[in-house]
Amino acid sequence: MTTAAFGSALKRKEDPRLITGQGTYVEDVSLTGMLHIVLVRSPLAHASIKSIDSSEASKSPGVVAIFTGEDLKEELGSLPCGWVVPDTKEVPHPPLAVDRVRYVGDAVVAVVAESTAQASDAASLVDVEYEELDTVIEMDDALADGAVQLHEDAPNNTAFEWEVDAGSISDARSSSDVAVTQRFVNQRLIPTAMENRGVVVDYNSGTDQITMWTSTQIPHLIRVLLALVTGHPEHLIRVIAPDVGGAFGSKLYLYAEEVIAPIIAKNLKRPVKWVESRSEGYLATTHGRDHITDIEIIGNRDGTITGLDVRTLANMGAYLSLIHI
């Protein structure tokens, strides 16, 4: 006797391995000779980088190398937007900031050491001098006349305007009985998956092969985008998504760390690991929502809807990654 596929309670098969601690997450991946990366991040939302002094950090125990955006800018490329709509204003997005930071948590320096603790200790010794610039917090303020401009290539702090138009809304208004309007404020949120993001990279200099373990929802797209950003041949990149401890959509992107780690592994000819702390994740992992939507529903007293006028402002942050509305 067989069990019907529909309308029956099917026993899950994946749970025992995970709830008994036999899963394999990025943090569980350990390779011989592996180094650890800690990133120095901007405490300011908008600032010019005046100087970076890593002399004391380089003397710290266990430190193997320290990289700035200036050091790696030719190799790191620019992070792309995963999906662009017509007339999107794409701006350069360096994985390690060069000259200017544009959000709290923007990565500025990568410290590489024999252990995470040693890299963290050394990172605390890196001295970055900033010149703080004006900021905007609310979307209405960002669009106001005279607002500080985050990117020269995106005037009025607007990445794109996407219009979908079918029929005449003015005709619907004039020929209908009633119109109801409402503003909806969809608050910003932080996904906070159980497993923080993490990356392990092994580079084989003999074959030029990059193998990456990363906590992601899109391993195939990560490979495509990584090849695009770094110029490394796609057929020489292998991306492995091991067990992923949640995401809520926050692991649908190519992140800066997924570009920084393979470039450092290639430079040092040793495996590297980066795993974010929980507090770091609040700064460096994408947030969600943060929309303001004004809706007008036009219709007749018999319940027929004759028109719908929807205008949405979406806070995309400092850079586009994957447009979602």
Residue ranges of predicted features:
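Helix-loop-helix junctions that connect adjacent transmembrane helices in secondary transporters/permeases
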Residues: 148-230
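Gly/Pro-rich active-site capping loops and adjacent beta-alpha segments
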Residues: 2-3, 74, 91, 118-138, ...
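Solvent-exposed alpha-helices and their adjacent loops that cap or buttress functional pockets
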Residues: 11-12, 29-33, 93-95, 100-105, ...
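Beta-strand segments within the central parallel beta-sheet cores of soluble alpha/beta enzyme folds
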Residues: 235-242, 270-279, 306-311
